[in-house]
């Protein structure tokens, strides 16, 4: 320290250069920590190394503003201060080790170096058990013993929901689904389901939250659908609005209001915004070239033109945007355009239109974006897509179209035109709210009191982050703009895209006919939610997650906990006397709960689900090691121990019922009904950063316990996969199965230079690849279980039994892979 303060030797110069470099790097990012929104090992290690310098007030650190702000942010944490005190008291590394053990792993327990699996979910981390300090154990036990407090119950909603002075007011929207498209699984997870989970979570947190959505009903697609079905556009909208509402009801999407855009309120509000933009000089006229299909006798809407992208050469780019490179396109820029209705080549015609002057609004937009993206929770893809738009420079955007079915343009020079859907549709959020309550402006013209969350897939980002905000900024009417823009990547189906026409993939109106409960669908879609990259729905993986995570992990733990109370303690929760092992479990569960709340607050929905499953895994191991079914038959000490383990376990089950509520509402309620759980446990558990307390005290009588989940069988999954896999083209003859006989009579083929794929060889040997995939996961999980038991030094009999199960699973796997199980011929001994 003296060397630094005296500024002698080269050490100070090296340190100063390093601090400069670090400060510059921190100043270029909007994240509070080195690697993201949550504190990581990198923050801990670096802040610990720099602690002697950065905590010394005598050093002139004012020039390192970003570095100082980062260090103050880390140092403000109570656990850091505690660890620092231990360093000063001579505990050195041990103090810092204790601090590091308390912190969440980078990216919420996801291994940085692990490679993503095919469905986009993180690969499992091969990490040891998290260390728990003595202080954590005692703190968790103290909190646990306080029990349920007198916090106010989560109130039932009373409509209309309006902003309140003393509340956190959250307005949630999900992208309006287009009315005549039946949503597939990717549409559902990308918008309404993700928003539903966050909304349910927010209500449990006690936030004053309003969730609105509805069908987007104007445009050419509706006109064409009406012509196909011999109905009017309004009749088509009425018909398919009901279809959407029915699908979302089955998926348990809990809107506060589900409306539509074909309303008088839509016309009123859209035309008001239009006149305000016109008044403030943000609209310009121009003559544009459009594509007109002479065969269909109409100008073609952008989405009814398809051709080659002029930027990336993608062959199926739409007339407004390329799905591959994400660039916006004018339809006339497409190479080799085709009308999607009749497949004829359209002609170019001129027409006069109105444009939103985006370049004139660009400065206002950038100022707002800088603030919103730095203070709000925008997903990385939303930020990236928005930056790319600004980097390329904004251009005037056409807001009118030569159509009949739409919100009419009120300007006398354009009375034959309607508003373009991407100017008109986002205004649907406002009009839908206005149809919910005549006090809608308290939500939409109240930016200082309301936080707005938009949920969507990534292709909708530019219209919500650039076009719509520019419309509202230009209107200059104190509109509420998006604070948190949450965009998913794409969910594919198996190894291809969803296609209604080809019968490929599961669509919303089909899911309920599979016999699989909606909660299981919700769970799996959220488990593979495409948060950081595209993911894929897979039947085999869905069965695997249902059978391993829901049935064998979560359901197994909750059912065992409840059944022990019923069988061993006559349905009443037994008395509990906590040992150190119990306190350790309470600390681990409390940490998982805190991580869950931290992630859910940041809309990290998929990662939040992993912490629920971690808790049930801890619970299963706890039961397995303590064996209450054996101890209940022993002496007084053993019976007391069985009671404690059972009581702690059933309380963890109660906690899980609360944490599951946003994801699996029916299962959550079923668990609470089985446990006869008090309503106050919800508000208590979700207080602050998360509070795990004893909510089912000794003497509490539970209800009837029954299994929560059913196994998905291989033959059931195979039938569903075939049903939703599409059909072979009729003109394609069925492939002839090769046998030894017809192989001999076939003409000689070229000799392959590589071996046949393993899957083909396995199939030829009578293998079952799908079953093999399920069994591979089962073998992995059973192996983990055996290793855990060995590490915990469980009884030899228990380990032997689990090893036997592992060996049996390996035999089943060998059969499924088509491997021979015949024992090798014994070698003759050389001894006489």
What are these regions (language model features)?
Residues 530, 537-546, 564-608:
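Long, amphipathic alpha-helical stalk/connector segments used for oligomerization, subunit docking
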Residues 301, 317, 327-330, 347-348:
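Short functional micro-motifs and their immediate structural scaffolds
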Residues 110, 119-213, 265-268, 321, ...:
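Structured secondary-structure scaffolds
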Residues 556-559, 584-587, 610-625:
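Core structural elements
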Residues 225-238:
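A charged helix-plus-loop insertion that forms the helical arch/lid used to bind
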Residues 90-169, 286-296, 307-326, 337, ...:
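Basic, alpha-helical terminal appendages of large translation-related enzymes
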Residues 239, 243-319:
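A broadly conserved sequence feature marking short terminus-proximal activation segments
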Residues 1-85:
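GST-like fold's C-terminal all-alpha helical module
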């Amino acid at each position: 320290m003296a060397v630094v303060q005296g500024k002698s030797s080269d050490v100070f110069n090296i340190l100063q250069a390093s601090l400069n470099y670090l400060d510059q790097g921190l100043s270029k990012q909007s994240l509070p920590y080195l690697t993201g929104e949550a504190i990581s090992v990198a923050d801990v290690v670096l802040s610990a190394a720099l602690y002697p310098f950065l905590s010394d007030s005598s050093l002139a650190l004012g020039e390192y503003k970003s570095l100082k702000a980062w260090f103050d942010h880390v140092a403000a944490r109570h656990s850091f201060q505690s660890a620092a005190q231990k360093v000063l008291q001579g505990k050195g590394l041990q103090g810092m080790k204790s601090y590091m053990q308390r912190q969440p792993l980078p990216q919420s327990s996801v291994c940085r170096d692990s490679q993503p699996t095919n469905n986009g979910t993180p690969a499992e981390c091969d990490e040891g058990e998290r260390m728990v300090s003595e202080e954590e154990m005692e703190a968790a036990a103290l909190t646990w013993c306080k029990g349920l407090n007198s916090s106010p119950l989560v109130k039932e909603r009373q409509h209309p929901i309006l902003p309140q002075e003393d509340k956190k007011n959250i307005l949630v929207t999900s992208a309006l689904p287009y009315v005549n498209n039946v949503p597939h699984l990717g549409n559902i997870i990308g918008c309404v389901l993700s928003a539903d989970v966050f909304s349910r979570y927010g209500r449990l947190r006690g936030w004053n939250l309003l969730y609105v959505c509805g069908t987007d009903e104007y445009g050419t697609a509706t006109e064409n659908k009406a012509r196909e079905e011999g109905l009017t556009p309004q009749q088509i909208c009425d018909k398919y609005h009901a279809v959407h509402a029915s699908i979302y009801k089955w998926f348990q999407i809990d809107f506060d209001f589900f409306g539509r855009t074909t309303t008088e309120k839509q016309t009123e509000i859209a035309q008001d915004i239009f006149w305000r933009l016109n008044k403030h000089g943000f609209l310009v006229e121009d003559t544009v070239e459009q594509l007109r299909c002479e065969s269909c006798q109409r100008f073609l809407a952008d989405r009814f033109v398809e051709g080659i992208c002029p930027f990336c050469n993608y062959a199926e780019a739409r007339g407004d945007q390329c799905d591959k490179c994400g660039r916006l396109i004018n339809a006339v820029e497409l190479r080799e355009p085709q009308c999607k209705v009749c497949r004829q080549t359209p002609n170019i015609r001129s027409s006069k239109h109105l444009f939103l002057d985006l370049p004139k609004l660009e400065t206002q937009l950038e100022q707002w974006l800088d603030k919103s993206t730095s203070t709000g929770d925008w997903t990385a893809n939303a930020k990236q897509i928005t930056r790319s738009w600004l980097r390329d420079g904004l251009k005037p955007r056409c807001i009118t179209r030569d159509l009949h079915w739409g919100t009419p343009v009120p300007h006398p020079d354009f009375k034959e035109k309607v508003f373009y859907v991407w100017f008109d549709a986002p205004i649907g959020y406002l009009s839908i709210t206005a149809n919910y309550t005549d006090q809608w402006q308290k939500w939409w013209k109240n930016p200082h009191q309301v936080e707005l969350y938009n949920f969507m897939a990534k292709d909708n980002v530019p219209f919500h982050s650039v076009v719509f905000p520019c419309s509202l900024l230009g209107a200059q009417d104190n509109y509420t703009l998006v604070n948190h823009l949450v965009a998913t990547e794409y969910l594919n189906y198996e190894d291809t895209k969803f296609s209604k026409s080809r019968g490929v993939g599961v669509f919303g109106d089909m899911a309920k006919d599979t016999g699989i409960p909606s909660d299981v669908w919700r769970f799996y879609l959220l488990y593979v939610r495409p948060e950081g990259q595209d993911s894929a729905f897979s039947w085999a993986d869905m069965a695997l997650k249902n059978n391993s995570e829901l049935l064998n992990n979560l359901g197994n733990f909750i059912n065992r906990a409840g059944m022990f109370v019923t069988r061993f303690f006559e349905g009443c929760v037994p008395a509990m006397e906590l040992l150190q092992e119990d306190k350790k479990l309470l600390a681990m569960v409390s940490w998982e709960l805190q991580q869950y709340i931290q992630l859910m607050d940041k809309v990290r929905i998929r990662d939040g689900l992993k912490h629920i499953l971690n808790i049930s895994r801890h619970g299963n191991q706890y039961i397995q090691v303590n064996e209450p079914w054996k101890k209940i038959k022993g002496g007084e000490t053993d019976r007391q121990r069985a009671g404690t383990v059972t009581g702690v376990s059933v309380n963890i089950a109660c906690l899980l019922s609360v944490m599951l509520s946003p994801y699996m509402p029916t299962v959550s309620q079923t668990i609470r009904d089985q446990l006869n759980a008090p309503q106050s446990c919800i508000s208590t558990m979700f207080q602050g950063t998360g509070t795990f307390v004893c909510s089912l005290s000794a003497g509490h009588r539970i209800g009837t316990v029954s299994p929560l989940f059913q196994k998905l069988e291989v033959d059931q999954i195979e039938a569903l996969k075939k049903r939703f896999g599409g059909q072979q083209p009729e003109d394609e003859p069925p492939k002839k199965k090769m046998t030894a006989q017809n192989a001999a009579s076939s003409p000689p083929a070229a000799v392959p230079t590589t071996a046949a794929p393993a899957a083909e060889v396995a199939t030829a040997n009578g293998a079952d690849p799908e079953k093999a995939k399920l069994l591979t996961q089962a073998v992995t999980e059973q192996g983990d279980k055996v290793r855990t038991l060995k590490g915990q030094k469980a009884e030899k009999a228990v380990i032997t039994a689990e090893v036997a199960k592992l060996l049996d699973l390996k035999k089943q796997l060998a059969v499924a892979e088509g491997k021979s199980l015949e024992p090798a011929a014994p070698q003759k001994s050389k001894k006489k």
